Amino acid sequence: MKFAFKILYWIQRLPFEMIQSLGALIGWLCYYLIPRRRHIGMVNLQKCFPQWSEKQRTALLKEHFRQMGILLMEYGLYWYSDAARIKKLVRYQDKHHLDDALAAGEKVILLYPHFTAFELAVYALNQDVPLISMYSKQKNKEMDEQVLKGRHRYNNVFLIGRTEGLRAIIKQMKKSDAPFLYLPDQDFGAKDSVFVDFFGTPTTTTPGLSRIAAMTNAKVIPAIPTRHGDGSVMLRFYPVWQNFPSGDVLADTQRMNDFIEARVREHPEQYYWLHKRFKTRPAGESDFYQETAHAAKSDKR
């Protein structure tokens, strides 16, 4: 693992254009070398874009692997590069929505879905804004130590372990003026989740956004990072959500998924398709991904 970190260190010393090209190559290779993830991505796209042809979905998935390869090769930038270099690669759009809320003394939750440029954007944002964020412990000890070191490189973030739960989040938000960075769009199982639609499919979704907003009186401000053709990233902030929370947790969680879906449709190749977003199914419904092992052997694309 330390050897991999050294490789990333030397990669970040390359010109940015070369890092992008190397990442694109790695993504292309991964598309063909990791059939299990390829299958998961294809199942997700079939569920979300059933009206598309197989050719369209395959083209988008290949582009998504390219984006993921770039994300992977950029980790050296996030961990080792000069902070000013990172800042130059990220531009803000409508950041006044966040600035105005913080200036008014509001508690803020940044709704921050998993787009492929999310790491680069947040490493730039954290230079300007202190953040509260969740952290999932890595299985590999060396990786866990490196990720934590990277997260704390500006001494401007407070991390809460995912196992600490809602109470730890509320406690930290109440004693801090920092926004809470909320990444909501993964399947953590049926416990403490609700089923609401995502691209028309019932999907286990954590209703934490509504509950945390209600318990802290926080304003919800979405922030979406998108990558441009030159590799730079635009982090766009959206207006504070009005009438949120509404008192109806299901309606609030559906509103969140609808917003994320709308943003995904704008940049579908940049959304994170390689995890099992639809893994947990309602009672009696079969596993969408159960053919993964067979498909991994037979899919030659």
State what each model feature region is.
Residues 14, 33-34, 49-50, 155, ...:
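A broad structural signal for alpha-helix termini and local helix breaks/kinks
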Residues 42-43, 122, 148, 193, ...:
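Short glycine-/small-residue-rich flexible loop motifs, especially phosphate/cofactor-binding loops
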Residues 33, 89-90, 113, 139, ...:
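Residues that cap or flank secondary-structure elements
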Residues 104-163, 190-197:
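Catalytic core of membrane glycerolipid acyltransferases/transacylases, capturing the structured
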Residues 1-112, 144-148:
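Membrane-anchoring hydrophobic helices of lipid-metabolizing enzymes
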